[in-house]
Amino acid sequence: MFKRKSTAELAAQMAKLAGNKGGFSSEDKGEWKLKLDNAGNGQAVIRFL
């Protein structure tokens, strides 16, 4: 089983990943779009890449 050598090393890796701006952005409006029909019912197409 996997055992961590150092929690400080893990924390440094997490901090490095948290600063990554190339990942998922919640501001991306292209992930899903809501469409309304004439009755006001909504449909959404969710795309996972």
From Swiss-Prot:
Record InterPro entries: NA-bd_OB-fold, Phage_T4_Gp32_ssDNA-bd_sf
Gene Ontology molecular function terms on file: DNA binding; zinc ion binding
GO biological process, one term: DNA replication
KW Zinc (keyword) present: yes
UniProt keyword list: DNA damage, DNA recombination, DNA repair, DNA replication, DNA-binding, Metal-binding, Zinc, Zinc-finger
Note: Interacts with the polymerase and the uvsX and uvsY proteins.
Role played: Binds preferentially to single-stranded DNA and therefore, destabilizes double-stranded DNA. It is involved in DNA replication, repair and recombination. Binds ss-DNA as the replication fork advances and stimulates the replisome processivity and accuracy.
Subunit field text: Homodimer in the absence of DNA, monomer when binding DNA.
Protein's name in the database: Single-stranded DNA-binding protein
Species the sequence originates in: Enterobacteria phage RB32 (Bacteriophage RB32)
